[in-house]
């Protein structure tokens, strides 16, 4: 699983651009989806997403973000679903207390701010193919209540 320290290295003070072609790397269809908000597992997965697409990815620096610092219900639910799927295939938990199901563990990791995933929000796709995104760590975001 992703180490907590690895997630903090994703952003620089400068905007970073990555350009690769589809043939160079392949990632799962979950990261290739065209949703506005995407869940990425680590900085390397984020780079893999860009390498698998034909677009240039521009990451907005932390201090210039324009979207809300609150997770939407969709984002929170997707984080829980992706994390529960990881746990169901023998992923290690970030919690000390025992829970009965992967969904319960994933929810508690989210609410305890220990979930090892990141949220990538697409801000804009320019006509020349640049995809402008913000990458958020759920630990620094407000979390909605999930039933």
Swiss-Prot record:
<dbReference type="GO" id="GO:0003677">
    <property type="term" value="F:DNA binding"/>
</dbReference>
<dbReference type="GO" id="GO:0019083">
    <property type="term" value="P:viral transcription"/>
</dbReference>
<dbReference type="GO" id="GO:0042797">
    <property type="term" value="P:tRNA transcription by RNA polymerase III"/>
</dbReference>
<dbReference type="InterPro" id="IPR006111">
    <property type="entry name" value="Rpo6/Rpb6"/>
</dbReference>
<comment type="function">
    <text>Component of the DNA-directed RNA polymerase (RNAP) that catalyzes the transcription in the cytoplasm of viral DNA into RNA using the four ribonucleoside triphosphates as substrates.</text>
</comment>
<comment type="similarity">
    <text>Belongs to the archaeal RpoK/eukaryotic RPB6 RNA polymerase subunit family.</text>
</comment>
<dbReference type="GO" id="GO:0044423">
    <property type="term" value="C:virion component"/>
</dbReference>
<protein>
    <recommendedName>
        <fullName>DNA-directed RNA polymerase subunit 6 homolog</fullName>
    </recommendedName>
</protein>
<dbReference type="Pfam" id="PF01192">
    <property type="entry name" value="RNA_pol_Rpb6"/>
</dbReference>
<dbReference type="GO" id="GO:0006366">
    <property type="term" value="P:transcription by RNA polymerase II"/>
</dbReference>
<keyword id="KW-1035">Host cytoplasm</keyword>
<comment type="subunit">
    <text>Part of the viral DNA-directed RNA polymerase that consists of 8 polII-like subunits (RPB1, RPB2, RPB3, RPB5, RPB6, RPB7, RPB9, RPB10), a capping enzyme and a termination factor.</text>
</comment>
<keyword id="KW-1195">Viral transcription</keyword>
<dbReference type="GO" id="GO:0030430">
    <property type="term" value="C:host cell cytoplasm"/>
</dbReference>
<dbReference type="InterPro" id="IPR020708">
    <property type="entry name" value="DNA-dir_RNA_polK_14-18kDa_CS"/>
</dbReference>
<dbReference type="GO" id="GO:0000428">
    <property type="term" value="C:DNA-directed RNA polymerase complex"/>
</dbReference>
<dbReference type="GO" id="GO:0006360">
    <property type="term" value="P:transcription by RNA polymerase I"/>
</dbReference>
<dbReference type="InterPro" id="IPR006110">
    <property type="entry name" value="Pol_omega/Rpo6/RPB6"/>
</dbReference>
<keyword id="KW-0946">Virion</keyword>
<keyword id="KW-0240">DNA-directed RNA polymerase</keyword>
<keyword id="KW-0804">Transcription</keyword>
<dbReference type="GO" id="GO:0003899">
    <property type="term" value="F:DNA-directed RNA polymerase activity"/>
</dbReference>
<dbReference type="InterPro" id="IPR036161">
    <property type="entry name" value="RPB6/omega-like_sf"/>
</dbReference>
């Amino acid at each position: 699983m992703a180490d907590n320290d690895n997630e903090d290295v994703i952003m620089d003070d400068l905007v970073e651009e990555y350009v690769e072609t589809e043939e160079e790397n392949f990632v799962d269809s979950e990261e290739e989806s065209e949703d506005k908000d995407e869940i990425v597992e680590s900085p390397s997965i984020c780079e893999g997403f860009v390498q698998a697409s034909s677009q240039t990815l521009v990451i907005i620096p932390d201090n210039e973000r324009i979207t809300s610092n609150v997770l939407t219900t969709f984002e929170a639910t997707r984080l829980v679903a992706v994390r529960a799927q990881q746990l169901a295939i023998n992923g290690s938990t970030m919690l000390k207390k025992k829970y009965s199901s992967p969904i319960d563990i994933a929810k508690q990791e989210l609410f305890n701010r220990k979930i090892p995933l990141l949220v990538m929000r697409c801000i804009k796709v320019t006509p020349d193919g640049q995809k402008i995104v913000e990458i958020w760590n759920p630990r620094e975001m407000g979390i909605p209540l999930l039933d």
